[in-house]
Amino acid sequence: MSDILDRLAEILEARKQASPDASYVARLYAKGTDAILKKIGEEATETVMAAKDDQAEKIIYEVADLWFHTLVLLAHKGLKPADVLEELARREGLSGLTEKANRQGGST
């Protein structure tokens, strides 16, 4: 799984040098964080709607869009999928309640 995430991360990094006229991702980068966050919000909503429709194919399609735009955000902020995978590995074996209690400030 991390192979495709790594390849996407490389492509997304390269798109930082692309023209916004030639690349959808470069256009998102040029518009800035708020535009990327708006797109993530749209994709999250579409994911929820697909889940409510209870159609596996639509759920997979929308989650792929959501993951992709989340990867765009990570790249925009200078982060990599490996950073998230490391955090997930750190949490592995912790109960959700324990993990939440361990967070600074105890917020979501």
Swiss-Prot record:
Q: Which InterPro entries match?
A: HisE, PRib-ATP_PPHydrolase-like
| A molecular function GO annotation | ATP binding
Question: Which cellular component appears as one GO term in the record?
Answer: cytoplasm
Give the first-level EC class, as a single word.
hydrolase
Single GO biological process annotation from the record = L-histidine biosynthetic process
| Pathway(s) served | Amino-acid biosynthesis; L-histidine biosynthesis; L-histidine from 5-phospho-alpha-D-ribose 1-diphosphate: step 2/9
The keyword Hydrolase appears for this protein: yes
Q: Which range is the signal sequence, renumbered to this chain? A: none
- Can you tell me which residues the record assigns to a coiled coil? none
Report which reactions are catalysed by this protein. 1-(5-phospho-beta-D-ribosyl)-ATP + H2O = 1-(5-phospho-beta-D-ribosyl)-5'-AMP + diphosphate + H(+)
Please state the Enzyme Commission number of this protein. 3.6.1.31
Primary subcellular site in the record, as a coarse category: cytoplasm
Q: Where in the cell is it found?
A: Cytoplasm
Q: Does the keyword Zinc apply?
A: no
Give one Pfam family: PRA-PH
The alphabetical list of record keywords is: Amino-acid biosynthesis, ATP-binding, Cytoplasm, Histidine biosynthesis, Hydrolase, Nucleotide-binding
State the similarity comment: Belongs to the PRA-PH family.
- Supply the name of the protein: Phosphoribosyl-ATP pyrophosphatase
